[in-house]
Amino acid sequence: MANIKQQKKRNKTNEKRRLQNFSFKSSVKTVVKQVKTAVANADKQKALALLSVAYKKFDKGVSKRVYHANFSARNKSDLQKLVNTL
């Protein structure tokens, strides 16, 4: 446990950010699953619409430093390849 006052404050903010990051990552995973489901159901229009949402979320995650840029690029590329199979 921290004894220094500033470290106690940092622990609070770190926990708050951790929960926000977890929530954000969960929402991204949900959209990715929806894209994969749309591809499995051969619904190209829905897949393309959800792909756009996924791209936005990955880019937002990079700008908020939730994700590394390479992680985001790799996942966007994989999703695009998946949608292109339709």
UniProtKB/Swiss-Prot annotation:
Record field: compositional bias (Basic residues): 1-11
PANTHER family cross-referenced by the UniProt entry: 30S RIBOSOMAL PROTEIN S20 (PTHR33398), SMALL RIBOSOMAL SUBUNIT PROTEIN BS20C (PTHR33398:SF1)
Xref: NCBIfam families: S20
Function as written in the Swiss-Prot or TrEMBL entry: Binds directly to 16S ribosomal RNA.
GO (cellular component) term, any one: cytosol
Protein name: Small ribosomal subunit protein bS20
UniProt GO molecular function: small ribosomal subunit rRNA binding; structural constituent of ribosome
Pfam families documented for this protein: Ribosomal_S20p
Record SUPFAM superfamilies: Ribosomal protein S20
GO biological process: translation
Family label: Belongs to the bacterial ribosomal protein bS20 family.
Organism: Aster yellows witches'-broom phytoplasma (strain AYWB)
Chain spans, region Disordered: 1-20
Keywords annotated in UniProt: Ribonucleoprotein, Ribosomal protein, RNA-binding, rRNA-binding
